């Protein structure tokens, strides 16, 4: 039997947001509003929140208390290690 390519909704959303960050569609410092992303991806906020937490662990976004999540600003020397 062949292998199945299967991604959860969270994985698909994580991949899409990661791609937008890497291509520059989402610039450093841009706030990532869960509700807006949920509307864009046609999902509830739960998989968006999970995707943003995954991207936070990867160092691509950061959470600030009482502010929310935003695309992380990185120094050039950090970019290679994080994104490649």
Spans of model-derived segments:
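Short linear motifs at protein or domain termini
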Residues: 1-84
């Amino acid at each position: 039997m062949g292998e199945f390519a299967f991604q959860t909704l969270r994985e698909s959303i994580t991949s899409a947001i990661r791609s937008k960050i890497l291509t520059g569609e989402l610039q450093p410092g841009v706030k990532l509003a869960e509700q807006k992303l949920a509307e864009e991806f046609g999902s509830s906020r739960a998989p968006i929140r999970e995707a943003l937490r995954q991207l936070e662990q990867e160092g691509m976004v950061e959470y600030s208390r009482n502010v929310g999540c935003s695309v992380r600003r990185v120094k050039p020397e950090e970019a290679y290690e994080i994104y490649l």
